[in-house]
């Protein structure tokens, strides 16, 4: 496995391996969820590139850019075990050199859920991912479904801008107690870590009510919210039932309905989601 920091060097590698690369974009501080993407990437292409870049343009004012966990040596160990050929780890000045002024925005699908509470977030995501696609030239790129809206936004971007690649969404990987794996979990105190289980428990409660015959979104929202509110300190950013394709709101739920939520536990904002009809 090699580590590349230069855009020019990464582009040269990509030219030599064109049509044979799978890309796993990450912000680093890798965990088993990331590793599962890399293992799957290994099955889909001759060469696997994992990008590690804490992208400043997707963080808003007073968000956790400066405190986002970073450990390249740790990341190299996990990536190597997962079969990665190249880590592309540029610095911000490589991706956004002096005078940089071009951004890409997907309008409607990015405007709600995380986009409503994090203005500019998805503009930063789509811009950096489009740049990675141009630099690495993958035939396939893999993303986790924990960031369900991000996946939907990127699918729309790929379609609208005619990127010649496949986007693959992979299932959420969870800890043994149900918490969705996230690099931000390491920022939780032991007490906060226990409280964070309210996200997966609220999903389980809503799905149980759905299996019991409840189809009213308003009623299902009350069931799910009650679990989180019962923990007192966690703060709900959003808890929504949406069409999984358009992400538009619904009045009645069915098996394809997406339950997506964002909850702040202490200073840490966590997200989770599930499709009501899936186990």
UniProtKB/Swiss-Prot annotation:
Residues the entry annotates as binding beta-alanine: 58
Predominant location category: cytoplasm
Major enzyme class: ligase
Highest rank taxon of the organism: Bacteria
EC number: 6.3.2.1
Annotated Gene Ontology cellular component terms: cytosol
Keywords: ATP-binding, Cytoplasm, Ligase, Nucleotide-binding, Pantothenate biosynthesis
UniProt binding sites for ATP: 27-34, 144-147, 173, 181-184
InterPro entries associated with the record: Pantoate_ligase (IPR003721), Pantoate_ligase_C (IPR042176), Rossmann-like_a/b/a_fold (IPR014729)
Subcellular compartments: Cytoplasm
Sequence positions that bind (R)-pantoate: 58, 150
SUPFAM superfamilies, sorted: Nucleotidylyl transferase (SSF52374)
Active-site residue list: 34 (proton donor)
GO MF annotation: an example: ATP binding
Pathway entry: Cofactor biosynthesis; (R)-pantothenate biosynthesis; (R)-pantothenate from (R)-pantoate and beta-alanine: step 1/1
Catalytic activity annotation: (R)-pantoate + beta-alanine + ATP = (R)-pantothenate + AMP + diphosphate + H(+)
BP terms from Gene Ontology: pantothenate biosynthetic process
Family the UniProt entry places it in: Belongs to the pantothenate synthetase family.
Misc: The reaction proceeds by a bi uni uni bi ping pong mechanism.
Record's subunit section: Homodimer.
Chain's role: Catalyzes the condensation of pantoate with beta-alanine in an ATP-dependent reaction via a pantoyl-adenylate intermediate.
Protein's recorded name: Pantothenate synthetase
Organism: Citrifermentans bemidjiense (strain ATCC BAA-1014 / DSM 16622 / JCM 12645 / Bem) (Geobacter bemidjiensis)
Gene name for this UniProt entry: panC
């Amino acid at each position: 496995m090699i580590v590349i920091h230069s855009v020019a060097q990464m582009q040269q590698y990509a030219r030599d391996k064109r049509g044979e690369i799978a890309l796993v974009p990450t912000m680093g501080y890798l965990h088993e969820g990331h590793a599962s993407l890399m293992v799957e990437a290994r099955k889909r292409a001759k060469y696997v590139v994992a990008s590690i870049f804490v992208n400043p343009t997707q963080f808003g004012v007073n968000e956790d850019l400066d405190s986002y966990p970073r450990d390249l040596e740790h990341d190299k160990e996990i990536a190597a075990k997962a079969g990665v050929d190249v880590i592309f780890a540029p610095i911000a000045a490589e991706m956004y050199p002096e005078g940089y002024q071009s951004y890409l925005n997907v309008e409607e699908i990015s405007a709600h859920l995380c986009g409503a509470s994090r203005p500019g977030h998805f503009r930063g995501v789509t811009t950096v991912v489009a740049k990675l696609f141009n630099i690495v030239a993958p035939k396939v790129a893999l993303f986790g479904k924990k960031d369900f809206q991000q996946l939907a936004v990127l699918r729309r971007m790929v379609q609208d801008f005619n990127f010649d690649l496949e986007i693959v969404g992979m299932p959420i990987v969870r800890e043994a107690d149900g918490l969705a794996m996230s690099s931000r979990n390491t920022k939780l105190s032991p007490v906060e870590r226990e409280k964070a289980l309210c996200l997966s428990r609220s999903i389980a409660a809503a799905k149980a009510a759905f299996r019991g015959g409840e189809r009213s979104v308003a009623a299902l929202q009350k069931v799910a919210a009650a679990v989180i509110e019962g923990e007192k300190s966690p703060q709900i950013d959003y808890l929504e039932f949406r069409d999984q394709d358009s992400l538009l709101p619904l009045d009645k739920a069915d098996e394809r309905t997406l339950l997506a939520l964002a909850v702040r536990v202490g200073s840490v904002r966590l997200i989770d989601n599930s499709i009501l009809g899936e186990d």
